[in-house]
């Protein structure tokens, strides 16, 4: 696990400046900071370098010469800094946005907490982290409309959108490729590589199906069964999906390590306060804070039996998963009719969609075969 975070700035006149640290007592020797500075100077570009200093490893993310800020993560000797690169790039943007305010030190603890669990994030959390980034969400929305965009155009567009901020386009695209959402390819007749949308993400609330099927079997007293089912039904009769609602759940619950531990437990059963207190060993130090976050996002309800025992129940679960964007075919057809996209780019987009479709069919067949084999055993 990481042990600390240091924010450094390089000033040509005064040299190294430490702008913030978490925990506050964390210190990196100036000699080591100069070594990091030299390594970044050697590459000359924004990005990450790693350095071993005594008994620790350091992963340093540099924003480039314009802002000259270094976000340095302190790791144990056994940890590999490369697994934190995408997470470092994401929190670096948020740190730069708060450099000129008094809020820098107050945002470091939650950013450090999220970064610390980055290597262990589940698939749904990784999708959530992507959507929680305004930059990645903006690019995804544009790709949904245009199907393909050149890398050079993305770079220019991002610089125009975030003139005062920092966007590492290469890192941004690498993260989306890793999640299987986009592919990058060259197209005959075009000088810049194109970024193609190959998968999309669906996000919405869903009823906790397994809990509803048999609440009693999931540790809810029989006397509370009807009340629980009625609560879930009432919520979804009025539920209207919205981006604001999705982002609130992602930010307050899905990407909060303590809240996510509680969600995982509540997906399995109805719980009491004692059940939640047992999660302290998994990092749930403040049960009241977690319950407040889940109550405010309308994900839970509390029921009381005739002995005044309280049961905390999941009334709304959250679905976030990739899906094949069939709507892209209509987009491609429309762009061909209006000649708003290069014909070779549209043909490449169709080829990629075809490849993605058959790849998914193959995966589904393999999964079905494996299921049959397990059932036969």
Short names for language-model regions:
Residues 2-3, 10-131:
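Acidic, low-complexity cytosolic segments
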Residues 139-140, 146-149, 160-165, 169-172, ...:
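Intrinsically disordered, low-complexity acidic regions
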């Amino acid at each position: 696990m990481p042990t600390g975070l240091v924010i450094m700035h390089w000033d040509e006149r005064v040299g190294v400046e430490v702008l913030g640290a978490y925990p506050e007592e964390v210190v990196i020797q100036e000699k080591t900071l100069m070594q990091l500075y030299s390594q970044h100077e050697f590459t000359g570009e924004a990005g990450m370098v790693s350095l071993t200093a005594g008994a620790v490893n350091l992963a340093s993310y540099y924003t480039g010469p314009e802002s000259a800020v270094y976000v340095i993560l302190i790791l144990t000797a056994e940890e590999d800094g490369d697994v934190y690169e995408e997470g470092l790039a994401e929190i670096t943007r948020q740190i730069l946005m708060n450099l000129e305010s008094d809020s820098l030190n107050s945002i470091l603890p939650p950013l450090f907490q999220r970064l610390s669990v980055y290597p262990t994030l589940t698939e749904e959390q990784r999708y959530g982290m992507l959507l929680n980034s305004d930059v990645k969400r903006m690019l995804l929305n544009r790709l949904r409309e245009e199907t393909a965009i050149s890398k050079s155009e993305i770079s220019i567009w991002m610089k125009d959108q975030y003139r005062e901020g920092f966007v590492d386009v290469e890192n941004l695209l690498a993260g989306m490729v890793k999640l299987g959402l986009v592919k990058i390819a060259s197209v005959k007749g075009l000088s810049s590589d194109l970024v193609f949308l190959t998968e999309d993400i669906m996000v919405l609330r869903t009823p906790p199906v397994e809990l509803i099927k048999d609440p009693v079997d999931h540790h809810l007293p029989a006397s509370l069964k009807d009340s629980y089912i009625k609560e879930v039904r009432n919520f979804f009769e009025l539920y209207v999906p919205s981006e604001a609602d999705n982002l609130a759940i992602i930010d307050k619950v899905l990407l909060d390590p303590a809240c996510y531990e509680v969600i995982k437990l509540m997906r399995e059963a109805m719980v009491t306060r004692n059940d939640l207190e047992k999660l302290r060993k998994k990092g749930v130090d403040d049960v009241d804070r977690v319950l407040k976050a889940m109550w405010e996002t309308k994900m839970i309800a509390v029921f009381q039996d005739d002995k005044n025992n309280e049961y905390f129940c999941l009334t709304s679960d959250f679905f976030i998963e990739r899906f094949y964007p069939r709507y892209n075919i209509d987009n491609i057809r429309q762009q061909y009719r209006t000649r708003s996209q290069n014909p070779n780019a549209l043909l490449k987009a169709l080829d990629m969609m075809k490849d993605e479709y058959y790849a998914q069919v193959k995966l589904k067949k393999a999964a079905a075969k494996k299921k049959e084999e397990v059932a036969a055993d």
